[in-house]
Amino acid sequence: MAIESDLDGASMDELAGKSYEALLYLMNKNKKRKPEKKDDKEKSSKKVQKKNKVIESLNEMEVEMEDENENENDEQEAIQYYINVESQDADETLHQEAQDSSEDPFHQHFDYDDSEVIKNSIAAYDEGKLCKSIEESKLGVSQSFFPDVTKRLPCSCLSEIKNIDDLGLKQRILDSYKKQKPSGQLTSMQIELAKAMFNYQDVFFTNMSMKSHKLGTSLLALHALNHVFKTRDRVLKNSARISQNPELEFRDQGYTRPKVLILLPTRNSAFEFINLLISYSGTNQVENRKRFDNEFSIEKEVISEKKPEDFRYLFSGNTDDMFRLGVKFTRKTVKLFSQFYNSDIIVASPLGLRLAIGNKGDKKRDLDYLSSIEIAMVDQAHALVMQNWEHIECIFDELNGLPKEAHGCDFSRVRPWYLDQQARYMRQTILFSQYNNLDINSFFSHYMSNIAGKVKFRSLLHGVLNRLGYKVTQTFVRISVDSIIKVPDARFSYFTGSILVQLKKYSQSGILVYIPSYFDFVRVRNYMDEEGINYSAISEYSSVSDMTRARNLFYQGRTNIMLYTERAHHFRRFDFRGVKAVVMYGPPTNPQFYVELVRMPMRTISEGNLDSDAAKCRIMYTKFDSICLEGIVGYQRVSNMCHGKHEVFEFL
């Protein structure tokens, strides 16, 4: 969050280094901004989204009024509970807590108070000075990154993990988990993942299968709950002690209550994740459960069994991508739809939270509830890329900033690294994705800056060329370009000057042109309009009727070329009839898309409209497409294809 300080002309860096001045500024400022002009309208074709927005707006006003009354009662009841517990055997309790703190990553990470080590580690991150290591792991390959400093935060106290008992979970969570899985066994994948996750390092797990994703989200739910329960227990215990002895001082808080942010692609994914949280929480009392079921589930599954398995996994249930809700935990209950400032966990879609945040310059902008997020989880990033990745970046730009208002904060209990605006370097970020791409990889580099280190887990990809099921000539053509900025022009020049010229010359029909970027799609479409080329087009913005018409014209041969965007395929997964050859303007982000596209001529062959040896596929790529290309051709080929002396590679 940008800060415009009036404190004696102090710069941003000076303000960040002076906690006392920062507090004065925070409590006394009255800043006004001129609104920026920015068109950020979000259009939705689903009526359910509009209905949910109206319902949520009305319900949020009602919940906010209820929360204000209930929150104070819950707090006082919990404090009294801990006063009673402390009074039973104070010495034993303090001794046990001290012992637990020395062994618990939660306390080692968030209670760390060596300001010099924190400062040096942050400087190393900002200057790009990182120690890197690569190791084989149960997940394939793990790449670790740490600040290149003499002394850094401890992060290895959970190095030996054999089962659920070794994760340092709160007893109520552990008991709830073992009721469902009495053995408490973890898979080798979960053990490897937990070593980094429960040590509060940043985690990026890519190339996740559907099975590994289910196992991974189970760990996410356990970790989120564990963090919330330990945070609340620490705060309430210390509040109880202060009520008995006001001279005691504790640094155990952030500015606001929410500590965990979870970003998910659909209401169904939120429905399943929140049910996991509830099942592990150790309570059967869930407020607003009926409303939650009504708004986040559906009565009957309508997805076609003919769709690919990964499509059915992602788009099952309620697929609405506009939602947000708070989740609050007390000793006895779980409250859904709690007001954000009284919540422990915020669960949202990027679109839903982005609309709540608003735009820079908005007069009534309220995002202070994001100031004290200590764990940020981005699940199924591959699906979020297909929505609007800019929402993710906007949200993370706003995380861990100085709040505009106090919100009842006791500043004497705020941790020093919050006051010094260092919270984003202490925050743990966890990122799960089915595959990697440039946007996701850039996010890992720029937004995951945990000074305890970060770990990237990825499989050794062997490619999908042997999964096609029939012989088809696949020609990969590397386009020479020395800068990523020049890539769009280079692709366009090659396509219009080489491929399109041949298509026009021979008047070949049944050509599917797959274009990953919508902006490239618009450019190619406009060019073909200018040249008077006969074509059909389907993008993510096409209406159902336009899609049906385009598919019919293409199949009947009344148009020779079909332009087709990656996002349209992600949301529709069409299997076109009449395809005789495939041209890929760039490698598909999802390797599974490559398999589906190259298989499309098989249908034409089976219908007797194409010879079995006549199917062709041509893929344009540059050296900057190495991440996507690796998933298609495999890690052993990608280096030579991107940097070798040859520019054309053919596979059969």
Curated annotation (Swiss-Prot):
What are the GO cellular component annotations? nucleolus; nucleus; small-subunit processome
Q: Which InterPro entries match?
A: P-loop_NTPase (IPR027417), UTP25 (IPR010678), UTP25_C (IPR053939), UTP25_NTPase-like (IPR053940)
Entry-linked Gene3D superfamilies: P-loop containing nucleotide triphosphate hydrolases
Residue ranges for the region (Disordered) are 29-74
- Tell me which positions the record assigns to the signal sequence: none
- Which GO biological process categories is it annotated with? maturation of SSU-rRNA from tricistronic rRNA transcript (SSU-rRNA, 5.8S rRNA, LSU-rRNA)
- Give the Acidic residues compositional bias ranges: 59-74
User: Which keywords annotate this record?
Assistant: Nucleus, Ribonucleoprotein, Ribosome biogenesis, rRNA processing
Q: Which spans does this entry mark as compositional bias, Basic and acidic residues?
A: 36-45
- Where in the cell does this protein reside? Nucleus, Nucleolus
Q: What is its main location?
A: nucleus
GO MF entries:
rRNA binding; U3 snoRNA binding
- Matching SUPFAM superfamilies: P-loop containing nucleoside triphosphate hydrolases
User: Which domain of life does this protein belong to?
Assistant: Eukaryota
Family indicated by similarity: Belongs to the UTP25 family.
Stored PANTHER family: ORF PROTEIN-RELATED (PTHR12933), U3 SMALL NUCLEOLAR RNA-ASSOCIATED PROTEIN 25 HOMOLOG (PTHR12933:SF0)
Tell me the subunit arrangement: Component of the ribosomal small subunit (SSU) processome composed of at least 40 protein subunits and snoRNA U3.
Task: Give the function comment from the record.
Answer: DEAD-box RNA helicase-like protein required for pre-18S rRNA processing, specifically at sites A0, A1, and A2.
Q: What is this protein called?
A: U3 small nucleolar RNA-associated protein 25
Provenance organism: Schizosaccharomyces pombe (strain 972 / ATCC 24843)
